[in-house]
Amino acid sequence: QLEAEGFKGIFVGSGAGLPNFMNIKGENSLNIMSSNEYLTRVNLMDAANPLADTPLNIGKHVLVVGGGNTAMDSCRTAKRLGGDVTLVYRRSEAEMPARLEEVKHAKEEGINFLTLHNPIEYIADEKGAVKAAVLQVMELGEPDASGRRSPVPVEDKTVTLDVDQVIVAVGVSPNPLVPKSIEG
């Protein structure tokens, strides 16, 4: 029908999608959230204000997981809120998908970069809040489909960091409700 009316295609804009998580032990602990939720709450809901309707726990030792632009935004936001921020990324800095300018600005603001490490578990305190992250030490293997060298775990080598907030910035996936709501 639409072709007869001169239309050439249809665009379905499903929004930013759903944030990805890593599905690791302890990831449902308190004070672990997606970068989408973190940045939305801080920037649009005044969540850094303890008197706000939905206040956010402001981390003193913040771990941001990921290597893209959103991870850099999350790092810099947490730093500006007073946190000691460490970015953890499973590949080397050269493989980070973030723009070089974003990485440069994050470093200038004092973000600690811990590359070739990947979270494998979060440990919670007696109240259910994250208190530590267990990181697998990685090394680079052969290039994958993206052309970047694949991260490979170094056997029996882990590091544990004390953290009180984790922001997961490992991408988004399409919302499955959109295709399910369209016929044909």
Listing of model-derived features with the role each one plays in the protein:
Residues 1-20, 46-52, 58, 80-184:
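A Rossmann-like FAD-binding core segment of flavoenzymes
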Residues 21-81, 183-184:
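Glycine-rich dinucleotide-binding loop and its adjacent helix/turn
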